[in-house]
Design a protein with these regions (language model features):
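An N-terminal structural lobe/cap that precedes and organizes the functional/catalytic core
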Residues: 1-11, 37
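Accessory "access/gating" subregions that flank catalytic or transport cores
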Residues: 204-339, 447-455
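Short, mixed-charge aromatic SLiMs
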Residues: 45-58, 90-97, 316-329, 371-384, ...
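Extended hydrophobic packing segments that form well-structured cores
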Residues: 419-455
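C-terminal regulatory domains involved in ligand/effector binding and gene-expression control
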Residues: 76-254
Length: 455
């Protein structure tokens, strides 16, 4: 399977790539399928049922909102973030929904959108089924979709493929493992980012690749800036107060930013994840729950590394993408499948390796940094309090961003040789996730989620 860096870094809406971005894409795919089969005009009603983690924590993750907006044709990349909640309230109050913003039908929020808290479909914890009926009640179409992490969606026709779409694009330097990536780098003399650039040419010109990645970086910058300027209480009922803006004022007043670099990194990550928790526009990196780590380390690179420039940003994102693909291919980036180690752990690994790349590291040092970043996130559980992407998620991104910088610096002090390979740690992460109780995989039925009183 060919995966593009633009599959891993996609612009979307918070608070969750698997529970918000993925379901919105799935619902939109369903509505477009109705149009494609020329039955859209005959639809009188639709029903959606959410299973597993989508059902257990969907309300806290904004899944119902995402499904409704997706049915109306909204895309995660372009959805009106500011008006989304208002539109959902209009649907609830009026009992009317516009499929693809074209065909209006009746819709009961209570009866036509069902969340099963303890029922799971066989393939993946994030499953959802949609049905469409005509005026007589006859079924026009039914489809089951799985949101497999990072906004990636598969339907029931592609079960087992674990991808958005089957893509057999021929790449110049195909690889599936870290060992294969290192071998290609040695044979060609290319850096990991240069190898990735050659592969991305299968889909886009070099100018399109660079401009596309810099567009994504600008969205990350805007998200960080918003998070550092907005105050108040995050939505959802936990009454979690935004802290990034206050921290930014304090750090600016204290001066000497270089002496406080680690605090700035933490701040950048928390700013992004506060925006994500508020349902703002973010970039999956590779998921929304871990969306603050890569932007934070990129801000560290730009603001604290001498000689940093936009060319380095492009190289950083290409190298991060290469590492992310290894996790996507050989394990999982879904908290509902392997716990938070698959989200924050993968992002920490990607950021660590990418930073080593732009610090001038060899391919071996990049692989070493990525391995360190994942190794020290093994076993990390996903136990969001109240099913919200707030506690412990916001602080956890800050901690992991600092850890990523530390991992890169450690790797740069060595020659790239080490005992545990990236492939081994990815395999270990997958096995650890398989052994992990479902209580700790984005169901809010264990850990902090049951030991913290929601008030």
């Amino acid at each position: 399977m060919a995966i593009s860096v633009f599959d891993l870094f996609s612009i979307g809406i918070g608070p969750s790539s698997s529970h918000t971005v993925g379901p919105m894409r799935a619902a939109r795919l369903f509505a477009r399928r109705l149009r494609g089969e020329e039955v859209l005009g005959a639809v009188a009603s639709v029903r959606a049922e959410l299973y597993g983690s989508l059902g257990a924590t969907g309300h806290g993750h904004g899944t119902p909102k995402a499904v409704l907006l997706g049915l109306e044709g909204a895309s995660p990349r372009t959805v009106d973030v500011e008006g989304a909640d208002t539109r959902v309230e209009q649907i609830k109050e009026s009992g009317r929904l516009r499929l693809l913003d074209d065909h209006e039908i009746g819709f009961s929020f209570d009866d036509d959108l069902i969340l099963h808290r303890r029922k799971t479909l066989p393939y993946h914890a994030n499953g959802m089924t949609l049905w469409a009926y005509d005026a007589s009640g006859a079924e026009l179409l039914s489809k089951t979709y799985y949101s497999v992490g990072g906004g990636f969606v598969v339907d029931d026709d592609a079960v087992g493929a674990d991808r958005i779409k089957l893509d057999d694009t021929a790449l110049k330097y195909p690889f599936r493992t870290g060992d294969e990536l290192l071998r290609l780098a040695k044979e060609t003399g290319l850096s990991i980012s240069a190898l990735m650039l050659e592969n991305e040419r299968a889909w886009r010109t070099e100018d399109e690749i660079r401009s596309g990645l810099l567009d994504i970086w600008r969205v990350m910058q805007t998200c960080t800036s918003r998070g550092m300027s907005r105050e108040g209480i995050l939505p959802g009922g936990l009454r979690v107060r935004r802290r990034a803006a206050m921290s930014a004022r304090q750090l600016r007043a204290e001066g000497e930013p270089l002496a406080r670099a680690m605090e700035w990194i933490t701040l950048y990550a928390m700013a992004v994840n506060e925006e994500n928790a508020a349902g703002g526009r973010v970039v999956t990196a590779p998921t929304n729950g871990a969306a603050g780590i890569i932007p934070a380390v990129l801000h560290y690179y730009i603001n604290f590394v001498p000689g940093a420039d936009e060319e380095g940003v492009v190289r950083f994102m290409l190298a991060a993408g290469a590492i992310g693909m290894l996790f996507k291919e050989n394990a999982s980036i879904s908290g509902a499948e392997v716990g938070c180690q698959g989200e924050v752990g993968s992002a920490c690994s990607m950021a660590a390796g990418a930073l080593a790349e732009v610090l001038g590291g060899s391919p071996e040092q990049v692989e070493n940094a990525a391995e360190i970043g994942m190794e020290h996130n093994l076993g990390l559980t996903c136990d969001p309090v109240g099913g919200l992407v707030q506690i412990p998620c916001i602080e956890r991104n800050g901690m992991a961003a600092v850890k990523a910088v530390t991992a890169a610096r450690m790797a740069m002090r060595g020659d790239g040789s080490h005992k545990v390979s990236l492939d081994k740690v990815i395999k270990t992460m997958k096995e650890t996730g398989a052994d992990m109780s479902v209580k700790y995989k984005e169901t809010a039925r264990g850990g902090l989620a049951v030991n913290i009183i929601e008030c």
